[in-house]
């Protein structure tokens, strides 16, 4: 009764209006699952391949080279033939069949988007067949921890058309007692931040992930606004105090790195100063270029002045030495997250563990391309004493799988955007629903989400 009888893929749109793939998996019993695959803008070079159409093919496709008709065809005409008749409850077998048939290191034959769509839809179908929630299906009876959210309130980098080079500035309501309370705290800060930006003459347009995207003079000004918003909202900017709200940064430094010079450049700020954009005419003596050691010193200044608890991709994906040195200095009191560095790949994570390049891994399902491989990576991270942060992508959909995944694996942290844009809110609403379902069994980690930091 749990045999797969039908797999159907469809080209749909993500939150940026770009094509992505939706997959349905149906069983003989009538149970079925559906999944939509996200897409990133700031991507690591070692990520599994997201298959897009060549502009010369699929001429009836309005989306040209951004289309995913080839991935859709691979699901409907190749992967479906491989999986019809398979037991939907055997997730690892389903994933292994696809991975082996693809036969490439980066899933370039079928496309990671095609394989992941089927993998996640199969998991949803399995949960539906057993009539249990997805988090229970994946995590079993121990799945009961809601994640501490990283809420992206100011966007920059590749996610916004503004003057801010670091990609994300986030708040983490560490002093909350429940997930519901963490959202309430974040909501208050978010709306007070909007008022403060408006009062200072800045726009409150939002970036890809729902955070505000103002033109500010430097990263310190961004952090000053966050500190004000936290205080005006009635909370304490702190990594440890009662009702404390901490700050997290995603620098996305691969986008700032010049391989030929070995330096990091604040490109957007440099352009704003060079072209004398309004408000930047008199900006002088601003350091714009950094070696790895200088960037470590810069982060050190920020950490000493602001309650920063987490920095993601502080260095480029090729700068293993920079990551390791930074971790050696700050790794006992700061969460140092690898995203582009490790791309949810257990083989690369193995090197990061050996070289002590970080103490936390960002987990993005589409970086590796299957549920089973994602679970393997998280298990490896936890065994090594690393925390794991479940993450969305900048090009999202209404799919809420990552919310269930965070609870299923008790990761304790999730990064899924701001408190605007339905594609982001959908995940928060799903987590509120899960917390309500778990009732008294629900656990919220708060400060304990950083269990592996000795000197926080």
UniProtKB/Swiss-Prot annotation:
UniProt entry tagged with the keyword Secreted: yes
InterPro entries registered for this protein in UniProt: Enolase (IPR000941), Enolase-like_C_sf (IPR036849), Enolase-like_N (IPR029017), Enolase_C (IPR020810), Enolase_CS (IPR020809), Enolase_N (IPR020811)
Main subcellular localisation: cytoplasm
Reactions this protein catalyses: (2R)-2-phosphoglycerate = phosphoenolpyruvate + H2O
GO BP: glycolytic process
SUPFAM superfamilies from the UniProt entry: Enolase C-terminal domain-like, Enolase N-terminal domain-like
Compartment annotation: Cytoplasm; Secreted; Cell surface
EC number(s) given by UniProt: 4.2.1.11
Pathway linked to the protein: Carbohydrate degradation; glycolysis; pyruvate from D-glyceraldehyde 3-phosphate: step 4/5
PROSITE patterns attached to this UniProt entry: ENOLASE
Keywords: Cytoplasm, Glycolysis, Lyase, Magnesium, Metal-binding, Secreted
Cofactor: Mg(2+)
Active site, renumbered: 209, 364
Cofactor stoichiometry and binding remark: Binds a second Mg(2+) ion via substrate during catalysis.
Superkingdom: Bacteria
Gene Ontology MF annotations: magnesium ion binding; phosphopyruvate hydratase activity
Pfam families in the cross-refs: Enolase_C, Enolase_N
Annotated Mg(2+) binding sites: 250, 312, 339
GO CC, any one term: cell surface
Record: residues binding (2R)-2-phosphoglycerate: 167, 364, 393-394, 415
Biological function: Catalyzes the reversible conversion of 2-phosphoglycerate (2-PG) into phosphoenolpyruvate (PEP). It is essential for the degradation of carbohydrates via glycolysis.
Family: Belongs to the enolase family.
Name used for this protein in its record: Enolase
Lineage: Bacteria, Bacillati, Mycoplasmatota, Mycoplasmoidales, Metamycoplasmataceae
Gene name tied to this protein: eno
């Amino acid at each position: 009764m749990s045999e797969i009888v039908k797999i159907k893929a469809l080209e749909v749109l993500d939150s940026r209006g770009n094509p992505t793939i939706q997959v349905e998996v149906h069983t003989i019993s009538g149970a079925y699952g559906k999944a939509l695959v996200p897409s990133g803008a700031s991507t690591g070079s070692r990520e599994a391949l997201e298959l897009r159409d060549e502009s010369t093919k699929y001429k009836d496709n309005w989306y040209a080279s951004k289309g995913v008709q080839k991935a859709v065809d691979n699901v409907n005409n190749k992967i479906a033939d491989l999986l019809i008749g398979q037991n939907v409850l055997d997730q690892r077998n389903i994933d292994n069949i696809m991975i082996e048939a693809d036969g490439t290191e980066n899933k370039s034959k079928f496309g990671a988007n095609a394989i992941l769509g089927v993998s996640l839809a199969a998991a949803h179908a399995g949960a539906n067949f057993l009539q249990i929630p997805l988090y229970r299906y994946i995590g079993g009876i121990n799945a009961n921890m809601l994640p501490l959210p990283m809420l992206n309130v100011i966007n920059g980098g590749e996610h916004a058309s503004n003057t801010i080079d670091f990609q994300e500035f986030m708040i983490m309501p560490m002093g909350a007692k429940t997930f519901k309370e963490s959202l309430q705290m974040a909501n208050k800060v978010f709306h007070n931040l909007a008022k403060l930006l408006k009062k200072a003459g800045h726009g409150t347009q939002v970036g890809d992930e729902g955070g505000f995207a103002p033109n500010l003079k430097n990263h310190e000004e961004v952090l000053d606004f966050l500190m004000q918003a936290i205080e005006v909202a009635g909370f304490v900017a702190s990594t440890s105090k009662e009702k404390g709200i901490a700050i997290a940064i995603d620098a996305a430094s691969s986008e700032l790195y010049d391989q030929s010079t070995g330096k990091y450049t604040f490109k957007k700020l440099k352009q704003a100063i060079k072209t004398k954009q309004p408000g930047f005419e008199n900006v002088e003596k601003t350091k714009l270029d950094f070696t790895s050691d200088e960037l470590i010193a810069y982060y050190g200044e920020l950490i000493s002045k602001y309650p920063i608890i987490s920095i993601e991709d502080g260095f480029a994906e090729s700068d293993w030495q920079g990551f390791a040195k930074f971790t050696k200095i700050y790794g006992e009191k700061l969460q140092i997250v690898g995203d582009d560095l490790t791309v949810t790949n257990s083989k690369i994570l193995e090197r990061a563990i050996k070289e002590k390049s970080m103490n936390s891994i960002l987990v993005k399902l589409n970086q590796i391309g299957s549920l089973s491989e994602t679970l393997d990576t998280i298990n490896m991270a936890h065994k090594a004493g690393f925390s794991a942060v479940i993450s969305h992508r900048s090009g999202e959909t209404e799919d809420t799988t990552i919310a269930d995944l965070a609870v299923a694996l008790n990761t304790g942290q999730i990064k899924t955007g701001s408190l605007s844009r339905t594609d982001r809110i959908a995940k928060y609403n799903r987590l509120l629903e899960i917390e309500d379902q778990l009732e008294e069994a629900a656990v919220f980690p708060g400060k304990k989400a950083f269990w592996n930091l000795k000197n926080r």
